[in-house]
């Protein structure tokens, strides 16, 4: 017998020779010995697993199967309903044989660690499914099938938790099961049972079939203790009972347990559908750092158990063990999985990859943890393969140590320990970092004492930290401390608040506007006290706390949005926040992702949350000076465009379901104003115009409830508007203004392409053609969008009388100045004031209207920067004026966006930079004979 090509002790050599000889002796005379390479392979397996050799001695027919180059899975056992007494032996022999095949493939390097874990999982599922199927038939004969009140037949659902649910079962593991059934009822057989008793008995018999140890061993150890109420709970619960339990009794550790849950036998479809309803329990909708509290408690209990039983050599529960990797990944999944569906992953290794992709673990750490996990799981499997024992402890017996080390390719035990130590150390360090004690710059004792003493005490401690109005801040803090929200906090939440408040006050002293920071901070806390997960975030993440106070001090708008939509706090922690912002395609993809949600209301809410988060990122980039305001307004327009396209898809789907579609019909949404001109602000409304077209011979939709074509498209436009303005838990998407449609407020909401073309040709005012310069199709059918673009070109390329054009432009500007300019002697209206943004727009629009007939390339532009460049290329604007006009435009947009971010009206005292920008715009207007009236602001010029 060739022995493995490693140096073994004489004792181990003799042991392997005896094991192989025993297998040879068990071989029937008529069965040929495979021979050749098989001898070496068998000796290699004998080194790693007594269990495998024992199985081969009892089932020598398995030898021929394993002698194949790539031995496939064994056929499932076939249970005879008439001979249930044979089922346990059949199941156990199958499990032993298939487990031996897994050992064979693992030891000989045919399978990766992941494949071995998946194979062990599939084996457990097959045993559960075969056993349950046989028992169900038996129960049908005795008791009939369970029928609910609605007449539907009910089946048992077997949920696999832990590693079974995650598809990563170790070689000799127990299986964590929970039994449930969709609805109550009664069986319809000769000996009827209520559903609860029926499924409890069925589940208990399934557990016994797998778990009992017989002369043939066991199939799988079954653990039912993770069911609701544990050993005190019912063996099987209806889905309604499960729902009630998790709503009222669900605990933090159960979120970890059910994160990996999967329906593995019985009515799998019903089980998976119910698990989807449990998702909000496992993954909270909002950022949830309270998950770390549950993790700390579980880790403390495990640490105590390890110490109590001297289990430092336990590679599962001990320091740097498998459990720490699992806890680390699962805690990050629970914290963010409610917001990021990609993190809702049952399997550990893909979960680590998802966390890296989401920026929650850096690439190097993610790779290190994955490597450590594979190392530990491979070692764990080999420990268990030795004797099919449910062990995670490193062996003490010298011979066992030698077998494990040599089987894994190490010359001696010490070499294996040397390889193991850095893996465990890396895991322990990463896990300790996650659960590290809260580290932050310690707030001065005076502030901590001040907060705890409220409402007693005075403002003296606040006077020394740089507040301009310490008395006002003191009153606000005292009122907050006595508020009903604070008084209603649990002890643990109050303890968090007592840690957070001094740190917040300390951070406020370093803010650019300390008084504003304190005032806005209290508003945010008051709005979020009901969700203690946000207190946990600030308690666990000092960097987020500092960033929050900085943002609050500099932006009243973002302070309001954070208070109204605390889910935005997640953005302060996202490592991607300081990187490049999403481009146009990424914004569209982010919004379109919501279309996979079947429920329109839920899709709308998700879309709004994404819009809020993305606009918040754009605002932070603007606030931090990481990009120019002109870029921010362009991105906001792209975002709005993506939202409108998504909403149109939702609205059209609803219309198709209710009324069918208009054959050959098309629909388009045109963006005017700041949306069309790619210069949208934070909180800006959207100027929209709706167009439609359809073949003349088609006069109605083709659904069950048909509408005439015009009415169908009007309903579609109304639905788009309703969805855009609908209130959701995340607010509403946009305010809509449709007054720029043909005939304004008196006109039809939706225009046919023909009527729109006729209106622009025959009845539109010059100012409407000016508005058309900045218009572009933002959503809808491509052919109609192209047709609109052609109408726009035809309209704007009309030959015009320059004098009349300039007169019309000046009159409209004078009218707007009189009605809309809010400037006064000391402040300029950045948009409507003299030399403001609208003056610049009018100059550019006049240039396009006057020149497009000779220079049609001008019509390729619709936004201010592109229009400046296009008109400069035609020399209508002097070449040397382009750069100054770009700068003037950027200066005014930046000033306006700064006002918006701090919730101030866009009225400011002109600075030298503003005055310079206005002068540039005045000069450009004068150069084209377009001197606009000064209006209210003339004294400031």
From Swiss-Prot:
Keywords on record: ATP-binding, Magnesium, Multifunctional enzyme, Nucleotide-binding, Nucleotidyltransferase, Transferase
Taxonomic lineage: Bacteria, Pseudomonadati, Pseudomonadota, Gammaproteobacteria, Lysobacterales
Q: What is this protein's function? A: Involved in the regulation of glutamine synthetase GlnA, a key enzyme in the process to assimilate ammonia. When cellular nitrogen levels are high, the C-terminal adenylyl transferase (AT) inactivates GlnA by covalent transfer of an adenylyl group from ATP to specific tyrosine residue of GlnA, thus reducing its activity. Conversely, when nitrogen levels are low, the N-terminal adenylyl removase (AR) activates GlnA by removing the adenylyl group by phosphorolysis, increasing its activity.
A molecular function annotated in GO for this UniProt entry is: magnesium ion binding
Whether Cytoplasm counts among this entry's keywords is: no
Stated name of the protein? Bifunctional glutamine synthetase adenylyltransferase/adenylyl-removing enzyme
Top EC class, one word: transferase
What's a GO cellular component annotated to this UniProt protein? cytosol
Question: What family does the Swiss-Prot or TrEMBL record give for this protein?
Answer: Belongs to the GlnE family.
Supply the EC number(s): 2.7.7.89, 2.7.7.42
């Amino acid at each position: 017998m060739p022995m493995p090509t490693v140096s073994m002790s004489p004792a181990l050599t003799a042991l392997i020779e005896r094991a192989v000889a025993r297998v040879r002796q068990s071989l029937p005379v008529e069965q040929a010995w495979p021979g050749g390479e098989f001898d070496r392979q068998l000796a290699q397996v004998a080194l790693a697993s007594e269990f495998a050799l024992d199985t081969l001695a009892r089932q020598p027919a398995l030898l021929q199967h394993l002698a194949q180059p790539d031995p496939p899975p064994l056929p499932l056992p076939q249970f005879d309903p008439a001979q249930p007494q044979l089922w346990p032996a059949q199941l156990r022999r199958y499990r032993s044989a298939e487990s031996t095949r897994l050992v064979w493939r693992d030891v000989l390097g045919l399978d990766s660690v992941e494949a071995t874990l998946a194979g062990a999982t599939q084996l457990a599922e097959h045993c559960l499914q075969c056993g349950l199927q046989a028992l169900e038939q038996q129960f049908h004969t005795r008791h009939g099938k369970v029928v609910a009140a609605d007449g539907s037949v009910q089946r048992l659902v077997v949920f696999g938790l832990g590693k079974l649910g995650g598809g990563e079962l170790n070689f000799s593991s127990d299986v964590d099961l929970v039994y449930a059934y969709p609805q109550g009822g009664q069986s319809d057989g000769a000996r009827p049972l209520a559903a609860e008793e029926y499924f409890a008995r069925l589940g208990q018999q399934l557990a016994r079939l797998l778990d009992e140890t017989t002369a043939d061993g066991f199939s799988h150890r079954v653990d039912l203790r993770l069911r609701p109420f544990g050993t005190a709970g019912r063996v099987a619960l209806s889905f309604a009972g499960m729902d009630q339990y998790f709503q009222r009794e669900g605990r933090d550790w159960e979120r970890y347990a059910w994160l990996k849950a999967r329906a593995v036998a019985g009515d799998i479809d019903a089980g998976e559908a119910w698990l989807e309803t449990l998702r909000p329990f496992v993954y909270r909708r909002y950022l949830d750092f309270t998950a770390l509290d549950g993790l700390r408690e579980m880790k403390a209990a495990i640490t105590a158990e390890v110490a109590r039983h001297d289990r430092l050599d336990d590679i599962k529960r001990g320091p740097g063990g498998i459990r720490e990797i699992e806890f680390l990944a699962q805690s990050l999944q629970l914290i963010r999985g409610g917001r990021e569906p990609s993190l809702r992953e049952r399997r550990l290794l893909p979960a680590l990859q998802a966390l890296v992709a989401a920026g929650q673990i850096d690439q190097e750490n993610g790779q290190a943890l994955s490597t450590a996990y594979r190392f530990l799981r491979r070692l764990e499997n080999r420990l268990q393969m030795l004797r099919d024992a449910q062990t995670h402890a490193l062996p003490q017996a010298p011979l066992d140590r030698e077998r494990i080390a040599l089987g894994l390719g190490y010359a001696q035990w010490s070499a294996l320990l040397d390889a193991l130590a850095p893996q465990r150390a890396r895991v322990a360090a990463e896990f300790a970092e996650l659960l590290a004690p809260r580290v932050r710059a310690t707030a001065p004792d005076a502030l901590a004492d001040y907060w705890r003493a409220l409402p007693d005490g005075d403002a003296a401690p606040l006077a020394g930290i740089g507040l301009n109005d310490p008395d006002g801040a003191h009153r606000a803090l005292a009122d907050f401390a006595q508020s009903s929200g604070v008084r209603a906090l649990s002890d643990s939440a109050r303890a968090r608040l007592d840690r957070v408040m001094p740190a917040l006050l300390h951070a406020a002293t370093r803010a650019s506007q300390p008084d504003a920071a304190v005032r806005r901070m209290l508003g945010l806390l008051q709005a979020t006290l009901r969700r203690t997960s946000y207190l946990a975030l600030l308690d666990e993440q000092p960097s987020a706390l500092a960033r929050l106070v900085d943002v609050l001090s500099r932006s009243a708008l973002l302070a309001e949005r954070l208070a109204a939509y605390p889910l935005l706090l997640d953005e302060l922690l996202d490592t991607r926040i300081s990187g490049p912002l999403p481009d146009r395609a990424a914004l569209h993809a982010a919004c379109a992702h919501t279309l996979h949600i079947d429920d329109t209301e839920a899709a709308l809410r998700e879309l709004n949350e994404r819009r809020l988060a993305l606009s918040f990122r754009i605002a932070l980039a603007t606030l931090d000076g990481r990009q120019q305001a002109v870029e921010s307004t362009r991105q906001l327009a792209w975002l709005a465009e993506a939202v409108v396209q998504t909403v149109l898809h939702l609205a059209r789907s609803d219309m198709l379901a209710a009324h069918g579609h208009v054959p050959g019909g098309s629909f388009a949404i045109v963006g005017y104003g700041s949306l069309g001109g790619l210069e949208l602000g934070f909180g800006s409304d959207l100027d929209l115009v709706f167009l439609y077209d359809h073949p003349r011979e088609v006069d109605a939709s083709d659904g069950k409830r048909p509408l005439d074509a015009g009415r169908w498209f009007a309903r579609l436009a109304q639905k788009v508007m309703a969805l855009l303005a609908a209130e959701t838990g995340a607010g509403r998407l946009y305010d809509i203004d449709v007054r720029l449609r043909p005939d304004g407020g008196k006109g039809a909401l939706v225009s046919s392409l023909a009527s729109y073309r006729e209106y622009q040709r025959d009845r539109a005012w010059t100012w409407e053609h000016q508005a058309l310069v900045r218009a572009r199709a933002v959503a809808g059918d491509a052919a109609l969008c192209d047709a609109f673009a052609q109408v726009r070109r035809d309209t704007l390329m009309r030959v015009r009388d320059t004098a009349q054009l300039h007169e019309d432009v000046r009159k409209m500007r004078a009218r707007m100045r009189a009605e809309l300019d809010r400037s006064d002697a000391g402040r300029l209206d950045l948009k409507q004031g003299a030399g403001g943004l609208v003056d610049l727009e009018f100059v550019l629009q006049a240039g396009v209207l006057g020149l497009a007939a000779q220079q049609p390339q001008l019509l390729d532009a619709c936004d201010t920067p592109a229009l400046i460049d296009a008109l400069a290329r035609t020399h209508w604007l002097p070449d040397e004026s382009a750069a100054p006009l770009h700068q003037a435009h950027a200066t005014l947009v930046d000033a306006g966006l700064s006002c918006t971010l701090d919730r101030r009206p866009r009225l400011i005292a002109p600075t030298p930079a503003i005055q310079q920008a206005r002068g540039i715009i005045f000069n450009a207007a004068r150069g084209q004979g377009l001197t606009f009236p000064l209006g209210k602001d003339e004294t400031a010029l």
